[in-house]
Structure formats: structure tokens, C-alpha cells
Regions:
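Short, well-formed alpha-helical segments that are part of the catalytic scaffolds
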Residues: 15-30
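Conserved donor NDP-sugar-binding/catalytic core segment of glycosyltransferases
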Residues: 98-128, 200
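A recurrent flexible, glycine/aromatic-enriched loop bordering the glycosyltransferase active site
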Residues: 121-124, 138-158, 171, 177, ...
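Catalytic donor/gating beta->alpha subdomain of glycosyltransferases that bind UDP-sugars
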Residues: 167-170, 176-228
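Acidic donor-binding/catalytic loop of UDP-sugar-dependent glycosyltransferases
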Residues: 48, 92-107, 180
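Glycine-rich, basic loop-to-helix element that forms the pyrophosphate-binding segment
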Residues: 66-82, 147-150
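A conserved acidic beta->alpha catalytic loop
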Residues: 25, 42-51, 94
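Short aromatic/hydrophobic "clamp" motif used to bind/position activated sugar donors
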Residues: 87
Length: 317
């Protein structure tokens, strides 16, 4: 059986710290597979990322430049220069196994799917934030999925072209929206653990986790998003309402202070607790439930802060 030519698109923006590990693994996998091309698209890096790629990875890596726009536009720009039958999107802070592209070809051939990939996992010796958040959201088995993150996603070129690529209006969440359009066209998306990648640049502290979720929230809420409102958005609104109710509960004059505190605390943690139960029902690992509850509280506070910031901007402008 003839294996397809694979075009690997790696978007880069200020990832010099992680690029050597990421590109070393990708280059080794490209050489092991044979019929593949590596396209690195620099998004205006200022930390020497582009120079690092030019000095260490040419000519095997082809470097393109893209200024401004979104990460979706960066990936689409790489695709325009690609010649492969299969497009493999791998982020610049992810490492992959040596047999990755052989496994990719096998999965596409045997699953009948038009898109595949896998979740990204934290590195060895992760921080507790990385470990708890990953265990909550990891997928236990191979199988058909609604979406796969674009940090580690592959799609048949014909399907990519048929749905029009990534939506360049979206600052974040472009992968879920793209996968939705694939499924709307009847294309299957299949996850295989053989394609698992290691993500090096996770949030490692509660503070960095909060900042990253604020950024994601600004992107998710601040751009045009076709289709239905997703569960995180609904739960963020619910959390804001319950948070306000909790504050009001403290002001109820007829209640004793212990009662007020218990009611307020219950309202504040209601949405995070519901999210935790949902993850448990979906197979998530609740090995550290109090820490998991804390992260979900931080998650909803961060998303709520992003929503409030955007509303404030709208009122001002």
C-alpha cells in the first residue's frame, strides 16, 4: 500500500525555549517516514525563534513568514504552500514519537476517518496543575470524537479544502469550529493514542493557569463564533449569576452569619462542582478532587473576567 505524502505545518510565535525539543522530534519522525515535508510558519517572533529554525533546521524545514492575523490564518498560510495529501498540524511546543507519521498513515487507512490526531499530554514530572487538569480531561480510549485540538491534528487535504480551512476570524477555538464543519460534511474524526504528543508549555501554576484561561476567554468571547453557544460559555454565565447570588446571600439580614457563609460558599462552588461531576461521568480522573475543584473555580473566574472585560470595552466603545 502506498503511503500518502504528509505536509507538517508548525506555527511558531516566540517558542525558542521549546523549539529544539519539538523540531528535533518532528525532524526525526520525518526522516523515519520519508515522504513528508516540514513547513514552519513564523508569526513575527521576537525571541530568536525564526533564526533558530533557519540555523538548525534548514533545508529540511521550509520557513514561511506571516505577520498579524490569528493562529488560524498562520496555519492556513502554511497549508497554501503544502503539497501533501495529508496535512499534519503540530504546535511548536509539542514533541512526537519517532513512528508518528507511519502511525498517522495507518490510522487514516484503517479508520476510514478524514481527520485524526490525539490529545496532548503533559511532560514527565508535571506540576500538580498540569497533572490534575490533564487527568480531568483525558480521553481513555481510541475512537470517534467530536473534535481534536489543532496542537496535534491531521486532516486529509481534500477534506480540509472542502470545508474551507480554519476560520481566520477566530482568535482561539478555531479547532473546535473547524472540526464541527468537518462533521457537518459527514467526515469522521478519529482519535488514536498512537498519535499522542507531549505538550511542553502548559500552565504550571494557578496564576499562569488563570492568565491563560483569561486569554482563551477573550479569544472565545471576543470573536464571531458560528453555531451554538458551547457548554463552557453557558457554565461561565451560570457561575457569574451564582457568584452574584452568593454575594447577595451575605447581605440577607434575617440569616445568621454561619448560614450566610454556608449558602454563599455553596453558590460560589456550585458551577465548579457541577463541572467536576460532569467530568467524572465522562471518565475523568478525580484523584485530587479538592485541587480539581479549585482549578475549575479559577477556570470560571478567569472566563468570567474575560467576559466582563469585553463587556466593559463594549460599553466604553
Amino acid at each position: 500500500m502506498t503511503r500518502p505524502r504528509v505536509s507538517i505545518v508548525v506555527p511558531v510565535f516566540n517558542k525558542a525555549r521549546f523549539l529544539p525539543a519539538a523540531l528535533d522530534s518532528i525532524v526525526a519522525a520525518v526522516r523515519a517516514y520519508g515522504d513528508a515535508e516540514l513547513i514552519v510558519v513564523d508569526h513575527g517572533s521576537t525571541d530568536g525563534s525564526r533564526d533558530l529554525v533557519a540555523s538548525r533546521y534548514q533545508p529540511i524545514a521550509r520557513i514561511l513568514d506571516w505577520k498579524g492575523g490569528t493562529i488560524a490564518a498562520v496555519r492556513n498560510h502554511g497549508v497554501h504552500a503544502a503539497s501533501g495529501e495529508v496535512l499534519s498540524f503540530i504546535d511548536a511546543d509539542c514533541t512526537i514519537p519517532l513512528d508518528y507519521f507511519g502511525s498517522l498513515a495507518d490510522v487514516l487507512a484503517t479508520s476510514g476517518a478524514m481527520a485524526t490526531g490525539a490529545e496532548v499530554v503533559p511532560p514527565s514530572s508535571p506540576s500538580w496543575v498540569e497533572e490534575v487538569w490533564y487527568r480531568l480531561h483525558r480521553r481513555a480510549r481510541d475512537g470517534e470524537q467530536e473534535w481534536i485540538g489543532s496542537a496535534n491534528l491531521a486532516v486529509v487535504r481534500a477534506a480540509f479544502d472542502a470545508v474551507g480551512g480554519f476560520d481566520e476570524r477566530l482568535v482561539t477555538g478555531e479547532d473546535t469550529e473547524f472540526c464541527q464543519r468537518l462533521r457537518d460534511r459527514g467526515y469522521r474524526i478519529y482519535e488514536s493514542k498512537r498519535l499522542t504528543a507531549v505538550h511542553l508549555d502548559n500552565a504550571k501554576t494557578v496564576g499562569s493557569f488563570y492568565r491563560k484561561e483569561v486569554w482563551r476567554g477573550l479569544g472565545m468571547f471576543g470573536t464571531v463564533r458560528p453555531g451554538a453557544i458551547d457548554k463552557p460559555t453557558v457554565m461561565t454565565v451560570v457561575h457569574l449569576v451564582l457568584l452574584a447570588a452568593g454575594i447577595l446571600a451575605l447581605a440577607v439580614a434575617g440569616w445568621a452569619w454561619p448560614v450566610r457563609l454556608v449558602v454563599a460558599a455553596g453558590l460560589v462552588v456550585a458551577a465548579p462542582a457541577a463541572a467536576l461531576l460532569y467530568r467524572a461521568a465522562a471518565g475523568g480522573d478525580l484523584g485530587r478532587p479538592l485541587r480539581a475543584l479549585l482549578l475549575y473555580e479559577v477556570y470560571f473566574v478567569a472566563r468570567g473576567a474575560a467576559m466582563a472585560r469585553l463587556l466593559f470595552r463594549g460599553v466604553r466603545g
